[in-house]
Amino acid sequence: MKQGIHPDYHPVVFRDISADTAFLTRSTVTSSTEIKWQDGNTYPVIDVDITSASHPFYTGKAKIVDTAGRVEKFNRRYGKK
């Protein structure tokens, strides 16, 4: 890799505010807020709305959407007459 052209890649904590879960990973994103992690070190923290801990697909709480009903409703409303 060329020196001096890549962004700083450092440990960051991503905190899921809806599931009250945090993940320590590496990223180029920066933050002015910090959090003390379980290992005793302080890391920048990024608050996010959805992660794998709260997304319905990953938690198994996905809802089935009635797309056929939506298509029929659309055709009734805007379809050919």
Swiss-Prot record:
Domain of life: Bacteria
Keywords: Ribonucleoprotein, Ribosomal protein
This protein's name: Large ribosomal subunit protein bL31B
Biological process per Gene Ontology, one example term: translation
Natural source organism: Cutibacterium acnes (strain DSM 16379 / KPA171202) (Propionibacterium acnes)
UniProt cross-references to Pfam families, sorted A to Z: Ribosomal_L31
The family this protein is said to belong to: Belongs to the bacterial ribosomal protein bL31 family. Type B subfamily.
A Gene Ontology molecular function term of the record: structural constituent of ribosome
Keyword Glycosyltransferase recorded: no
Subunit structure: Part of the 50S ribosomal subunit.
GO CC terms, sorted: ribonucleoprotein complex; ribosome
Gene3D superfamilies per record: Ribosomal protein L31
